[in-house]
Amino acid sequence: MLTKKYSEELEKVFSFLNEIGIAIIEKELDEATFLPGLSLGSNCIYIDSDKLLYPGDILHEAGHLAVTTTSERKLIGTQAMSSEWPTQGDEIGAILWSYAALYHLELPLEFVFHPNGYKNNSDWYISNFNSGNYIGLPLLQWMGLTLSESQAIIENKKAFPVMQKWIRD
């Protein structure tokens, strides 16, 4: 149960994440984190709203949880999780997953792909996504999360950016 009042966009994000099984937990984060105000745990995102700089980063972090296998996801935030996590593939998957979430939630791409994110390459990602160049799509399809256009036709289902499921098995 969230105790603070958040923007309409964040309330929409929190509702979506709750629906797919990713908990949002308000918590004061004393330690330094990669993204200010955010830390990951097993199927949850810890949020320190006083330190959170870019609310859209929550969706990106949710993408990391979503593209991680169930067996590894339960280790996130513990010493048992590999120091190699997330891999470059996980990063690519989380980026594309967050794009699909934005599409699903009907939020602007700049909500996640803000000017100070992605090593100042947010405009490059936005341009690629707007052109239908979905970097990492074969990976998300391999993970069983979505379908390419050609596979969607074969299976008579909707193609990416529509997701077949949001959380990897």
Question: What do the PLM-derived regions correspond to, one by one?
Answer:
Residues 108-120, 124-128:
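Catalytic and binding regions of secreted/periplasmic enzymes and modules that target cell-wall glycans
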Residues 67-98, 111-114, 118:
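Post-HEXXH active-site segment of zinc metalloproteases
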Residues 1-41, 51, 100, 104:
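Auxiliary, metal-adjacent structural segments of Zn-dependent hydrolase domains
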Residues 42-57:
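Short pre-active-site segment immediately N-terminal to the catalytic Zn-binding motif
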Residues 125-169:
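Pan-zinc metallopeptidase signature
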Residues 56-69:
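Active-site recognition of the HExxH zinc-binding catalytic motif
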Residues 9, 55, 90:
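Hydrophobic (often cysteine-bearing) scaffold residues that line and stabilize catalytic clefts
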Residues 96-103, 144-145:
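Short, hydrophobic/amphipathic alpha-helical patches that form generic packing surfaces
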